[in-house]
Amino acid sequence: MLAALALANALPVITCDAPKVHDGDTLRCGPERVRLFGVDAPEVKRGKTPAAPFAYEARDELIRLTRGHVACRFVERDRYKRFVGKCWSNASPDINAAVIRSGYATEYRRYSKGAYAKAEAEAKSTGRGHWAGR
């Protein structure tokens, strides 16, 4: 267990102030395009493809959560070579969970393996975001 903790603490961390937010699960922190680990947010409008429902609410929530200083710990590189990470800020000790808890994004279980199940259950049970009225 100590070896696992040492390895987790040895993984790279990037930091930035007021990152540029692309959508509800992607931001730019310095030179790195960061995909939030375990988070799946609706896509914003791209070209002729219209925005998915709640895409801009998810983006705005991530903007709110990333005001000020942000740090992201590396998890892996995805197939697009993006830095996939677990992020925190002055506004939240766990941005990934907070976006899911808002109800505007869901857990990306294929990768997270249930790491954010509690956050998603909270969003559902309280009827937040896209869970409202369900």
Regions found by a protein language model. Name each.
Residues 2-134:
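Small beta-barrel nucleic-acid-binding modules, primarily SNase/OB-fold domains
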